[in-house]
Amino acid sequence: MEGLSFGPLSILPSLAEELNPHRVAFLTNTTVERLWLEKAAEGIEEPIRIVIPDGEKYKSLETAVAIWKRLQEEGFTRKSLLIGLGGGVVTDIAGFVASTYMRGTLLGLVPTTLLAQVDAAIGGKTGVNFNGKNMIGTFYLPNFVLIAHETLSTLPEEEIRNGLGEVAKYALLDRKVYALARNFEGISETLIRECALFKVEVVEKDLGESGLRRILNLGHTAGHAIEKLSNYRIKHGLAVSMGLMVASKVGEELYGFDSGKTEELLKKLGLPTGHPFRAEEILEEMRLDKKAWYGRITFVIPVEIGDVVVEEVDEAVLKRALEATRDDSGSGDCQKPGGSA
C-alpha cells in the first residue's frame, strides 16, 4: 500500500526527496494554485507547475493529453515525480497521467478536500470521464499520500458536507468511526485518520476490487444513480448520503438492520436522509451502473454497524426502499453538521 502520511505541507519536500526524483511536477487546479501551491512547492527545486481549470468536466482525456504533452516538453521521465495537489478531480487525473505516461512515473498525492482525504486519494483508483464517470482508468498506487489537515481551513462549508457523506459511509462500515461520527462536533484529524486507515486496510487486502473492496461501494449504487439523475447538481457526498439511507432500508427489510441509526447519524452530520426522484427512475440508472452484473443490481447491505454483505437484491425490495426514502421537499431533511439528531 502507498505510504500514508499525516502532517503539515512543510514535510512534502522530505517525502519527495526520499524518492530521489529526476524532476518534480505539480498538477493542481486554479483555486488550489492560488491557495496552496506556493506553500506546497517551498523547498522543492524548480518544480514544473501544471494548472488545469476547476471542475469535473475537465477530468477528461483531452486534459490528460495536454498534461502528457507538457511533461514530454519538460523532459519528464519515469524517474520523475508527479504530485497531484487538489481535490478528487486532480488526484484522479494525476494518478491516471502518472500510471500511463512512459508506463508509469513516480506519484505523490496531496488531497486538499475532505472527500479526497478520506476517500478519493486513497487506494490507487485513477480515472477520467468518458461517456460516463470514471469510464477510463487504472489501478495505480501512489508512492505517498500526504494528508495535511491545514488545507481544509479554506474549504467551503458545502465541500465539508460533501466529504461528510463518505465519512458517514465509513461510520456504517467501522465501529470506531461510528463512535467518532455519532458524537460529531466538527472535523478532527482523528476522524480523518480513522477513515483513511480503514480504507487502507481494506485496499491492502483487495487492490483490484475483486472481493472485499466492494464493501466501500456502500451507498454508491443508489448514490451514483441519484447523482446522475440530478445532472450532478447533487454533490457526490450528498448523493452517497441518500444512498446510505436507501441501503439501510434494504438492510432493515432483509436483515433487521436498524435504519434509525443511519438516519440519526446523517442528521448529526447535517446530511440528507431522503432523495427527490421516483423509484423507477433510480432503478433504471442502477441497472446501467458499472457495478451491476448483466443488468442485475448488486448492493452493499448493512446488517449491523460494522458488518455488511454484498449480494444481488430483488428489485421489489429496492423499490420499497426507494419509495420509503423519497423526499420531495428538496431539503432531504438537512441541517448544519454537529446539530442534535
Swiss-Prot record:
It holds the Pfam family DHQS_C. It is an enzyme of class 4 (lyase). The keyword Cytoplasm applies. One of its GO terms (biological process) is chorismate biosynthetic process. One of its GO terms (molecular function) is 3-dehydroquinate synthase activity. Belongs to the sugar phosphate cyclases superfamily. Dehydroquinate synthase family. Catalyzes the conversion of 3-deoxy-D-arabino-heptulosonate 7-phosphate (DAHP) to dehydroquinate (DHQ). NCBIfam families: aroB. This is 3-dehydroquinate synthase. It comes from Thermococcus kodakarensis (strain ATCC BAA-918 / JCM 12380 / KOD1) (Pyrococcus kodakaraensis (strain KOD1)).
